[in-house]
Curated annotation (Swiss-Prot):
HAMAP family: Salvage_MtnD (MF_01682). It comes from the Bacteria. Belongs to the acireductone dioxygenase (ARD) family. The keyword Metal-binding applies. One of its GO terms (biological process) is L-methionine salvage from S-adenosylmethionine. Coiled coil: none annotated. Transmembrane segments: none annotated. SUPFAM superfamilies: RmlC-like cupins (SSF51182). Ni(2+) binds at residues 99, 101, 105, 143. Catalyzes 2 different reactions between oxygen and the acireductone 1,2-dihydroxy-3-keto-5-methylthiopentene (DHK-MTPene) depending upon the metal bound in the active site. Fe-containing acireductone dioxygenase (Fe-ARD) produces formate and 2-keto-4-methylthiobutyrate (KMTB), the alpha-ketoacid precursor of methionine in the methionine recycle pathway. Ni-containing acireductone dioxygenase (Ni-ARD) produces methylthiopropionate, carbon monoxide and formate, and does not lie on the methionine recycle pathway. InterPro entries: ARD (IPR004313), ARD_bac (IPR023956), RmlC-like_jellyroll (IPR014710), RmlC_Cupin_sf (IPR011051). This is Acireductone dioxygenase. The record marks 104 as: May play a role in transmitting local conformational changes.
Length: 179
């Protein structure tokens, strides 16, 4: 399950309700949708194709519809990062640069896991997410993304506009990232 790790003092929060409560103070949405409804072969398949994508999106149709209506999102797709991803290290180098978006960054983790370090006040909070969990990093929040030791993640991404997801880097700001 999710875990928050505060870099300044090493504090860890693992209780889902405490995570949800803390993050909501800063506009970050955290929720658990679970993965029980997905057949394991669909969930674990990292060779994504149209049939696999449709099966995943259909399995979460109700939650996606509610999220879209509540937050104004219009479309979704599936993203996969794994050892099979061409130029994975090059992609990860881009994702590990501190940035923000003009739109929310919405990810529902279908399989795998990852870390969203987010600047919160004068600290950096590592938000560890796993299969079955939803995270919404609000527009304008300074953050980046890292794969964890498993080096794979499969997510539903949700957008208001495709252009809104483009990263905006500020070369004058630096973040403390793990190498």
């Amino acid at each position: 399950m999710a875990r928050l790790v505060f870099r300044k003092n090493g504090k860890v929060i693992e209780n889902p309700e405490e995570i949800k409560s803390f993050l909501s103070q800063y506009g970050v949405v955290y929720d658990v949708w679970g993965v029980d409804r997905l057949p394991e072969d669909v969930r674990k398949n990292y060779d994504i194709d149209e049939e696999n994508s449709k099966a995943i999106i259909q399995a979460y149709e109700k939650e996606l519809k509610e999220l879209k209506e509540k937050m104004g999102y219009i479309t979704e797709d599936i993203v996969v990062l794994s050892e099979k991803t061409p130029n994975l290290d090059g992609l990860m180098a881009k994702f590990k640069r501190e940035h923000h978006h003009i739109d929310d960054e919405v990810r529902f983790v279908v399989d795998g896991s990852g870390i969203f370090p987010v600047k919160i006040e004068d600290d950096i909070v590592d938000i560890h997410v796993e299969a079955g969990e939803l995270i919404v990093v609000p527009a304008g929040a300074r953050h980046w993304f890292e794969l964890d030791e498993n080096r794979k993640i499969k997510c539903i991404r949700v957008f208001k506009t495709p252009a809104g997801w483009e990263a905006i880097y500020n070369e004058n700001e630096t973040a403390t990232m793990r190498d």
